[in-house]
Amino acid sequence: MASAGAGLSKRGASNVDAIMPGIRAALLERTRPTVPRIDLSTAENWLLRNEVIELTKDAIRDGLKPHHLSYPNEFAGDADLIKALAAFVNEYFHPHIPVEPDHIATAPGAATCLNTFLYNLCEPGEGILVPAPFWNGFDWLFTARSSAVPVMVHVERSADTLTAKLIPALEKAYEESKIPIRGLLLTNPQNPYGQCYPRSVMEDCIRFCHSKGIHYISDEVYALSNFENPELPDAPPFVSALQIDVKGIGCDLSRVHTFWSTSKDFGSSGFRVGCSITQANEAMHVALALASNTESSSLSAVASTALLTSPRLPELLQLNAQRLQEAYCLMTNFLKKHQIEYIPANSAPFLFARVAPQAQTWEDEKAVIAQLKEAGVNVSGGKAYHVNEDQKGWARLTFALETSRAEEAIKRMETVLGKQ
C-alpha cells in the first residue's frame, strides 16, 4: 500500500489508497491551462439561489442570537431547526403517522446522516442492496467510515428498475450475496433517472425487506424537485416512505427510515443541513443523534429554519418547479436537435442522456466525456453509476443552471456532440 509507512490504521490506509489516484489526477488537472469549465456533473440546483440568499441573509441578520454561538440546545440538533423540519415534512411529505421532533436527528447533509446510519446498522463487510444504476457517491460513502458494502441489484433491462420487475432482482441479489445483507437503499426520486418509484413498487420493496428481516432505507433528497413534463403524462407522483401505512401492509415500522436535506430541493448544498427520520426505533434514533448532535452549524440552522418556515415557501417551491421545467426544456431541445437519446425526467435537476451513442466499450464512453471536458463542460459518465453492460455511452447532465450558463454549456457541447 502506498500509505503503509504513514502510520495510518488499516481502515485509514485503505481509504487513502482507494482515493489517492483520483486526487492526484484532479491536482494535475488543475495545473493545466484551460477555459473555466461549466459543471454539469454535480447535481446542484442553481435556479433559486438569489431568492434563497435574500431570505437567509435577512434571517441571519434578524434571527442570529447569542445562544446560537453555543453548541446546539437539543440532543439531536438545534431545537428550532428540528421543530421546523417536523412541520415541513408533515406539510409536504404527507406522512401516514405525523412526524414528531423526537423522530428526527440532524447532521451536516443527508450523506452524513446516511453514513451515520450505516455505521450503526452494519458490521464491517456487511452489505446493503442498492438498485443500479445509482449515485456514484455511494461507493465511497458506504466504505469510508462504515466499511459497509453496496451490493448492486441489476434488473435485466435498466429501464425496468422502477417497476415491479425490481422485486425478483432483489430476491436474486439477496440469495446470491456472499456477505450478510442488512438493508435495501432506495433513492426516490431515482438518481440518475430523475423519476419516481410507484407506490406499489415501494410497498413491495418494504414487504421484501420485512420478509428478510432487513431495513428499508429511503433516500429522498430530491423529494420536492418535481416539475410538469408532457413527455411523462402518466408518471407516478413522488410518494415518501413516510406516506406508506407500513403496519397496514403487515410490516415492521422500526425497520423503515427516511433521509432528506435542504441541499437539492433548495439548491443549498453548502449549508450542510440534513436529517434522518425514524419513527419507531428509539435505539437507532439515539445512535444517529449521538453521532452528530454537535456537528451542524448554528448559522446553517438559523438559515434553514427561516427557509423551512418562510411564508414564501409555497411560492418558492412553485417557482422552482417552473424554472426546472424551463431549464429541462432548454437542455432537451438541444438533445432532440442532435437526435441524442435521453430518459425523460420530472423529479430532479438532471437527466440521463446517451452522449456517446456509438460507444462499444467503456473507453469509448470515457473518450467522449474527455472531449466534452476539453470543450469546457464536465459531465458524469454512466459507468460511474454502475449501469448495465449494454448501456455504454450514457452520462448524467445537470440542467438546473442559470439560463446564460446553460446556453454556454450547450454551445460548448455542440462542438463535440454535433459532430457525431
Curated annotation (Swiss-Prot):
Residue numbers of N6-(pyridoxal phosphate)lysine PTMs: 264
Pathway the protein takes part in: Mycotoxin biosynthesis
Q: Which InterPro entries match?
A: Aminotransferase_I/II_large, Ethylene_sulfur-biosynth, PyrdxlP-dep_Trfase, PyrdxlP-dep_Trfase_major, PyrdxlP-dep_Trfase_small
Native organism is Aspergillus oryzae (strain ATCC 42149 / RIB 40) (Yellow koji mold)
In the UniProt record, the gene name given for this protein reads aclI
What does the protein in this record do?
Probable aminotransferase; part of the gene cluster that mediates the biosynthesis of aspirochlorine (or antibiotic A30641), an unusual halogenated spiro compound with distinctive antifungal properties due to selective inhibition of protein biosynthesis, and which is also active against bacteria, viruses, and murine tumor cells. The non-ribosomal peptide synthetase (NRPS) aclP is responsible the formation of the diketopiperazine (DKP) core from the condensation of 2 phenylalanine residues.
List keywords of the entry alphabetically.
Answer: Aminotransferase, Pyridoxal phosphate, Transferase
Q: What is this protein called?
A: Probable aminotransferase aclI
Enzyme class, UniProt record, top EC level: transferase
